[in-house]
């Protein structure tokens, strides 16, 4: 019996999360697998007194890891379970600064990026010298982001020194970064889905009310054909990060594309609707190829 697991976060409440797991379960079961969907509070994984990892999940052939809990993913992988995506790929995509560093020096076009200085003393103010460096390097407007976050949260457009000082203070005690604002891409970007190293679908996302184009923030999507240059770039990004599946957000600059973010658990409900591509089926087929048809 082919048996797989879809693991989700116990605190995830958005309908998009349940859609993700139910669609994948549906398509995997069409291929003949028994699929269980578990929240991460529905099993145990721990290190016992002998220093060995124990888990209640040993009966599964694979796990689609729809979570970002890096400790559980590392334990499961060290125990021998095949994860989609793998532990390190999830970690590298979850931290935006790490993503950019991993892609650096590889010919991947990205916005000009500064890592924010991490403050361990909340009462300390961000120095004028730090603000000067950010201003001089990026100019206005610029973008500030927390390194951890999804759905457009903790992403700020900064227009002047006063806003920079305020947001720098807000973010100083958490990992964060500052980036060049790509004005041509304000309120729009391209979401590209890559599965098994190949582009599977793409859509243009746009918003009339926000510089962020996330569907979850009120943006809309439309099907788009992307050129060979962008296809090759996105496939290279997925390869460099060792991703079985991902959604890549691409900014559109006057002189070409810029990779903005890479999402290891990108929602696919919206892109399935606007493109007609059965993303869940493509992902299920990739998993079967990796697990059962080697």
Predicted regions, residues:
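Generic beta-strand structural signal
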Residues: 85, 194-195, 252
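Conserved N-proximal alpha/beta basic substrate-recognition cap immediately N-terminal to
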Residues: 10-122
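C-terminal active-site "lid" helix and adjoining low-complexity regulatory extension at the edge
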Residues: 225, 239, 252-294
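Protein kinase-like catalytic core scaffold
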Residues: 142, 200-201, 246, 258-260
